[in-house]
UniProtKB/Swiss-Prot annotation:
<keyword id="KW-0963">Cytoplasm</keyword>
<dbReference type="InterPro" id="IPR042460">
    <property type="entry name" value="DCN1-like_PONY"/>
</dbReference>
<dbReference type="GO" id="GO:0005737">
    <property type="term" value="C:cytoplasm"/>
</dbReference>
<dbReference type="GO" id="GO:2000436">
    <property type="term" value="P:positive regulation of protein neddylation"/>
</dbReference>
<keyword id="KW-0833">Ubl conjugation pathway</keyword>
<keyword id="KW-0597">Phosphoprotein</keyword>
<dbReference type="Pfam" id="PF03556">
    <property type="entry name" value="Cullin_binding"/>
</dbReference>
<dbReference type="InterPro" id="IPR014764">
    <property type="entry name" value="DCN-prot"/>
</dbReference>
<dbReference type="Pfam" id="PF14555">
    <property type="entry name" value="UBA_4"/>
</dbReference>
<dbReference type="InterPro" id="IPR005176">
    <property type="entry name" value="PONY_dom"/>
</dbReference>
<feature type="domain" description="UBA-like">
    <location>
        <begin position="8"/>
        <end position="45"/>
    </location>
</feature>
<dbReference type="InterPro" id="IPR009060">
    <property type="entry name" value="UBA-like_sf"/>
</dbReference>
<comment type="function">
    <text>Contributes to the neddylation of all cullins by transferring NEDD8 from N-terminally acetylated NEDD8-conjugating E2s enzyme to different cullin C-terminal domain-RBX complexes and plays an essential role in the regulation of SCF (SKP1-CUL1-F-box protein)-type complexes activity.</text>
</comment>
<comment type="subunit">
    <text>Interacts (via the DCUN1 domain) with the unneddylated cullins: interacts with CUL1, CUL2, CUL3, CUL4A, CUL4B and CUL5; these interactions promote the cullin neddylation and the identity of the cullin dictates the affinity of the interaction. May also interact with regulators or subunits of cullin-RING ligases such as RBX1, RNF7, ELOB and DDB1; these interactions are bridged by cullins. Interacts with CAND1; this interaction is bridged by cullins such as CUL3 and strongly inhibits the neddylation of CUL3.</text>
</comment>
<dbReference type="GO" id="GO:0005634">
    <property type="term" value="C:nucleus"/>
</dbReference>
<keyword id="KW-0539">Nucleus</keyword>
<feature type="domain" description="DCUN1">
    <location>
        <begin position="60"/>
        <end position="248"/>
    </location>
</feature>
Length: 259
């Protein structure tokens, strides 16, 4: 705040007291509203998340971010980070590449496909998150993972995962890949996850279409422990119909569970 005039510093303090926003957000919001305190506070309360995000973006050192990108970029193609660079990035963050945390980062970067980031995805993604170092990103991760408690944000991550995980030229997601990602994203969220995966590997053995992937989340959210509220006449994919038929005897004790 040392570069601000005395009157501006007063407004920053008043803005922070009124909104509980950070100093950085206060300065950004006041600057955007020509230092008019009332207008700035009104704007902030209409969309606090946006102002927080923009103030974070404005704090990123783009030169530092370019240097960070250079650490990871593919030696053969400077416009992307390949699998070796992703591994180094994960090592710097002390993360397992197969962890939910790395998937959350890819989601925030809006990555098109697994095992690589384009330069634009990496630079824009880090800027959007207000990060120009792996240390800042690591510190931010717990808050990003907290966002998944919001059902709408989790649904967005879940639907993103299908496109991210599949081969770019294919419409469906290979079964083994689908099972691996379901274990990652639905563990602790879908009560029939193990039974579903067993059913698929034993009886389906084909790729998973997008609508089946997307609707499984809705199915998992609404289905009763004994499957009694399943509507066979509902607009569920055939694969989910077949699963319910397979699973009912297991969950109601009609035959022994494989678990």
């Amino acid at each position: 705040m040392h570069k601000l005039k005395s009157a501006q510093k007063d407004k920053v303090r008043q803005f922070m007291a009124c909104t509980q926003a950070s100093e950085r957000t206060a300065i950004y919001c006041l600057t955007q509203n020509e230092w008019k305190l009332d207008e700035a506070t009104d704007s902030f309360f209409q969309n606090p998340e946006a102002f927080h995000r923009e103030s974070m973006k404005s704090s990123v050192d783009q030169k530092k971010l370019e240097q960070l990108y250079s650490r990871y970029k593919d030696p053969q193609d400077e416009n992307k980070i390949g699998i070796d660079g992703i591994q180094q990035f994960c090592d710097d963050l002390s993360l397992d590449p197969a962890s939910i945390s790395v998937l959350v980062i890819a989601w925030k970067f809006r990555a098109a496909t697994q095992c690589e980031f384009s330069k634009k995805e990496f630079v824009d993604g880090m800027t959007e998150l207000g990060c120009d170092s792996t240390e800042r990103l690591k510190a931010l991760l717990p808050r990003l993972e907290q966002e998944l408690k919001d059902p709408a944000k989790f649904k967005d991550l879940y639907q993103f995962t299908f496109t991210f995980a599949k081969n770019p030229g294919q419409k469906g997601l290979d079964l083994e890949m689908a099972v691996a990602y379901w274990k990652l994203v639905l563990s602790g969220r879908f009560k029939f996850l193990d039974l579903w995966n067993t059913f698929l590997l034993e009886h389906h053995k084909r790729s998973i279409p997008r609508d089946t992937w997307n609707l499984l989340l809705d199915f998992g959210n609404m289905i009763a422990d004994d499957l009694s509220n399943y509507d066979e006449e509902g607009a569920w994919p055939v694969l989910i119909d077949d699963f319910v038929e397979y699973a009912r005897p297991v969950v109601t004790g009609g035959r022994r569970s494989p678990f």
